[in-house]
């Protein structure tokens, strides 16, 4: 009995109540939902009861196909029935008739979930914000879109705002769009290289998650690009920015989780100016308890921040870091020295033959956290027989007085060749902590 009720010719899905069937159809594109109408007489008009349209311009052949389809749907169900609308298109800024025509039909609809996805990343759609629709929006997702200029705006119900390569009319418009959303909780911005915003202000009393991505190298802005974050309830902050001249964090939750992949760009700046910018940024996140930091950011900070006394993250309890395995013996003790109360460390070691090995740090630095707080270390990348990696493991085992667990992974590609020797060397390493459990995966 697969898909059919025993003793009858009716399949299991068809006997489900219509509200549940409509909910299932809501996860399909409208084109696929319409195709189910040929299954039986019961399915013929079922797709019309799905309060969501997911359209793709490539599915139509006429000049204004999407708008005509929307008209027919609204005439059948009524303007107040539609709750979700998504349009996939491939048009550029010079051919926006499809988008404009669809938006005109949605003017009086109480849309809660609205999404525009431009299939061609190099093309940009010009999009106006429709004021009546804004009052009911809960989720707004735009991809490769130029926002038209707007004045006062209100998004009283908006909780989710995801912008992929969206171009704002001005600095002020970006600030207003965020500030006029009093219940916003999830904000993701991936800025376009054509965006002229120079000061991005993220001010929200309700925001809990903020992701910023800015990795293009050619930007039209001529001034210093900075980010100002004033989000007292923020619980997750993900920064991936390779062109920033500065961050200013006014407020965020003390329990915030921070993911840092940042490289500061100071055009014509001195080494001291770079250090000052880095110190300002580190001061902004000095009270976080959980941090993930990329290899790029770690190398950049380590290279430019040769200050004494070194900056301290007194509240940091969990750290996940990526670094070159060749330079890890020199870098790791220095990084750990900045985290005197660290309890959990996760490492990803990346091998690069162009990076020279460093060992002096291991011989001279004994960070405080190794003596007083570090309880677990998880090395996510497979351990090989390279001297630096084995020395790193020995260093942690021999100097961590409070270590309770060390998790290692063997290199699967060379397990047969190196496993016996690796295990023997690791197991024979002296352990400072008698409670340390060695886990080999």
Curated annotation (Swiss-Prot):
Segments forming domain F-box: 10-56
Limits of the FBD domain: 366-410
Database matches in CDD domains: F-box_AtFBL13-like (cd22160)
The name this protein goes by in its record: FBD-associated F-box protein At5g18780
């Amino acid at each position: 009995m697969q898909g059919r009720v025993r003793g009858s010719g009716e399949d299991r899905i068809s006997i489900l109540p219509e509200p549940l069937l409509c909910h299932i159809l809501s996860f399909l594109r409208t084109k696929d939902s319409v195709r189910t109408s040929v299954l039986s007489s019961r399915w013929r008009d079922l797709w019309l009861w799905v309060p969501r349209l997911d359209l793709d311009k490539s599915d139509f052949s006429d000049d204004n196909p999407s708008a005509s389809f929307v008209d027919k749907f609204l005439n059948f169900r009524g303007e107040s029935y539609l709750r979700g609308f998504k349009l996939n298109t491939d048009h550029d800024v010079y051919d926006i008739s499809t988008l404009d025509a669809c938006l005109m039909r949605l003017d009086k609809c109480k849309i809660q979930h609205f999404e525009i996805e431009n299939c061609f990343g190099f093309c940009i759609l010009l999009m106006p914000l429709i004021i009546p629709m804004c009052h009911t929006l809960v989720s707004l997702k735009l991809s490769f879109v130029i926002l038209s200029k707007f004045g006062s705006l209100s998004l009283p119900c908006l909780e989710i705002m995801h912008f992929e390569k969206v171009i704002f009319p001005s600095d002020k418009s970006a600030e207003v769009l965020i500030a006029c959303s009093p219940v916003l909780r999830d904000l993701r911005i991936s800025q376009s290289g054509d965006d002229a915003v120079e000061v991005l202000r993220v001010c929200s009393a309700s925001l809990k998650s903020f992701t910023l991505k800015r990795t293009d190298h050619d930007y039209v802005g001529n001034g210093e690009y900075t980010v100002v974050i004033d989000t007292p309830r923020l619980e997750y902050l993900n920064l991936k920015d390779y062109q920033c001249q500065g961050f200013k964090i006014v407020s965020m939750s003390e329990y915030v989780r921070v993911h840092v992949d940042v490289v500061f760009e100071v055009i014509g700046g001195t080494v001291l100016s770079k250090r000052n910018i880095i110190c300002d940024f580190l001061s902004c996140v000095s009270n976080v308890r959980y941090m993930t930091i990329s290899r790029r950011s770690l190398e950049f900070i380590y290279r430019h921040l040769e200050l004494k006394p070194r900056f301290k993250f007194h509240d940091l309890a969990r750290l996940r870091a990526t670094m070159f395995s060749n330079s890890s013996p020199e870098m790791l003790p220095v990084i750990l020295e900045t985290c005197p109360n660290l309890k959990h460390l996760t490492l990803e070691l990346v091998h690069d033959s162009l990076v020279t090995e460093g060992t002096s740090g291991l011989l001279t630095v004994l960070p405080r956290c190794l003596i007083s707080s570090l309880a677990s270390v998880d090395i996510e990348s497979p351990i090989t027989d390279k001297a630096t990696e084995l020395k790193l493991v020995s260093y942690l085992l021999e100097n961590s007085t409070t270590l309770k667990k060390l998790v290692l992974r063997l290199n699967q590609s060379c397990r047969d060749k190196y496993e016996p020797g690796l295990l023997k060397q690791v197991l024979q390493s002296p352990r400072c902590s008698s409670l340390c459990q060695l886990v080999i995966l």
